[in-house]
Amino acid sequence: MGMYLLHIGNAAVTFNGPTPCPRSPYASTHVNVSWESASGIATLWANGKLVGRKGVWKGYSVGEEAKIILGQEQDSFGGHFDENQSFVGVIWDVFLWDHVLPPKEMCDSCYSGSLLNRHTLTYEDNGYVVTKPKVWA
């Protein structure tokens, strides 16, 4: 089982789902996470199946200084990174919407988000990180 952590502000929830690094180098795990401020409900989907729902920080508002951190656990917002707690593998695409998607859309492979365009992001790589376009669909 894989462990997925979602941090909202200084609150966090943990989901146990499929291992994020399949044995075949060409297989992938499709992961979707939603969080709604009004209810505080976070939902994790993996490979089109609901993994679970948990409450995390109802009413929290994401500020202008928000950061999206992928593949690295932090002990606190803005805290330090530990290379022994790093994701090892490939992240192909990242999309972000300004609303919670309905379950049907959450299960589908989506093509773009409404808030995040990874091609216009500023990246900060820590350790050995390679950023390249994907070579297969």
Curated annotation (Swiss-Prot):
Tissue expression notes: Not expressed in the intestinal tract including ascending colon, descending colon and rectum. Not expressed in the human colon cancer cell lines HT-29 and CaCo-2.
Lineage start: Eukaryota, Metazoa, Chordata, Craniata, Vertebrata
Protein name as catalogued: Putative mucosal pentraxin homolog
Family: Belongs to the pentraxin family.
Keywords carried by this UniProt record: Calcium, Metal-binding
Pfam families, per the entry: Pentaxin (PF00354)
UniProt key word Flavoprotein: no
Single GO molecular function: metal ion binding
Gene3D superfamilies: 2.60.120.200
Gene transcribed to yield this protein: MPTX1
